[in-house]
A protein has these predicted regions:
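Residues in well-ordered beta-strands of folded domains
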Residues: 8-11, 23, 66-67, 196-198, ...
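Active-site-adjacent "gating/activation" loops or surface patches in catalytic cores
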Residues: 1-20
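Short, glycine-/Ser/Thr-/acidic-enriched flexible segments
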Residues: 12-15, 26-29, 38-39, 52-54, ...
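Active-site-proximal structural scaffolding
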Residues: 1, 15, 24-29, 40, ...
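Secondary-structure transition/capping motifs at alpha-helix termini
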Residues: 11-16, 38-47, 58-60, 269-274, ...
Length: 409
């Protein structure tokens, strides 16, 4: 399987290694996660890849992954020493920066970089731009503009989807063996312990949700949706767009066949009990005030620890209609310090099931499935016979979850 996902190596304080893949739509944090500096003491994260994985079943039943790329392709705006120091260090040399600000001395700058803007520069359109007079970390299209004026104009000096393309060897936390496709000295790729799907969802979707079985995990991936960001060329910014397995722009063949291929992995595995556990994560829940309820970035290591604890059978979970959710007490709050911290009150909210929201979510998935199954324009027997069909196992999971939600108190 070729798949748009990052690959990371996570090492616990007990020196136990886990390999995790995470498939998110563009601008939802794949690169940030792949190079994260864990907030939890004693945990170490290394990067295998930030964008693509090739997956292959092993003779032992495990799923192995390699990174076929030789570098990183990250979103520039928002990348800073606070959000992801390892990502910024990866850009120190040999890096291409399209559509960012060019400074008079030949350097680069972008919004939320965490450093002062230059007094003047050339913006992503090739036009002059100037430092804001009351916020040294903002730039406007005219000299002497205030922060309020720039905000009202919706001007950005660096394009919201401006990027950096850096060689992988620059990464200070590169897992060199994993990057070279080796595990225990053999060129097998790294064995995957957990698969994460995710998206940018301001409501309904909990912080982390574990699939109850392989088919349920494939359903999670098939149902994935995300708030549209500037990384997508669209006039629907802010609306939820279905993006199954974070592969919508990249499917090389019919999406229904792709789902079936994932389902077949369980049947064809040499030992299906060794397949990775599947989870759905959401770092982007918002409160009624529109602010994020989870700090993200290095604090996402708290969720990864819970996932590892589940793999090891160390913690129990809430058995809900939508999957296994964590008890808030099992999300570690060790070293919960700094500028952005986990709010325990918010944490309790984002590990609950929003019944009404989920019933609407299931309706949305059902409607999206129907789109994939649209009949051909001509009703010939041959075309009808080859019309795409959502696998029965996924429809059964949808019906099962819908019924369980309806019956829940």
């Amino acid at each position: 399987v070729q798949w748009c996902t990052c690959i990371l190596t996570l090492t616990s304080p007990e020196k136990k290694q886990y390999h995790v893949t995470a498939a998110f739509p563009s601008a939802c944090g794949k690169t940030n996660l792949a190079m994260m500096l864990p907030k939890l003491p004693g945990w170490k994260l290394q990067t295998v890849g930030d964008d693509i994985a090739w997956l292959k079943p092993g003779e032992d039943g495990r799923l192995y992954a390699i990174n076929p790329e030789n570098g990183f392709f990250g979103v520039a705006p928002g990348t800073s020493n606070d959000s992801n120091p390892n990502e910024l260090k990866s850009c120190k040399k040999g890096t291409i920066f399209p559509n960012v600000v060019l400074t008079p001395d030949g350097d680069i700058w972008w919004e939320d970089m965490g450093i002062d803007a230059p007094a003047e520069g050339i913006d992503w359109k090739g036009n002059p731009c100037y430092r804001c007079i009351d916020d040294r970390k903002r730039m406007g299209p005219k000299p002497g503009m205030t922060k309020a004026e720039i905000k009202e104009s919706k001007y950005v000096a660096a394009h919201k989807n401006s990027r950096f393309t850096a060689p992988a060897v620059n990464c200070p936390v590169l897992d060199k063996a994993g990057f070279n496709g080796k595990f225990n000295g053999k060129a097998t790729g790294v064995p995957i312990d957990a698969i994460l799907f995710g998206g940018r969802r301001p409501s309904t979707i909990p912080l982390v949700n574990q699939a109850k079985d392989w088919a349920h995990g494939v359903f999670m991936g098939s149902a994935a949706g995300s708030e549209v960001t500037a990384a997508v060329i669209s006039d629907q910014i802010g609306q939820v767009r279905r993006d199954p397995m974070a592969m919508l722009p990249f499917f090389g063949y019919n999406v229904c066949d792709y789902f079936q291929h994932w389902l077949e992995m369980e049947r064809t595995s040499a030992d299906a009990t060794k397949l990775p556990k599947i989870y759905f994560v959401n770092w982007f829940r918002k409160g009624d005030d529109g602010r994020f309820m989870w700090p993200g970035f290095g604090d996402n290591s708290r969720v990864l620890k819970w996932i590892c604890d589940r793999i090891e059978g160390k913690v129990k979970a809430q058995d809900t209609p939508i999957g296994y959710l964590p008890f808030a007490k099992d999300i570690s709050l060790e070293n919960n310090t700094g500028k952005d911290t986990v709010n325990p009150k918010f944490l309790k909210e984002i590990v609950k099931v929003d019944k009404a929201g989920w019933l609407k979510e299931i309706e949305g998935v059902e409607a999206n499935y129907a789109e994939y199954e649209k009949k051909p324009s001509k009703d010939s027997k041959e075309e009808l016979a080859h019309a795409p069909r959502i696998p029965r196992a996924l429809k059964a999971k949808l019906a099962e979850i819908q019924a369980a939600l309806a019956a829940a108190k």
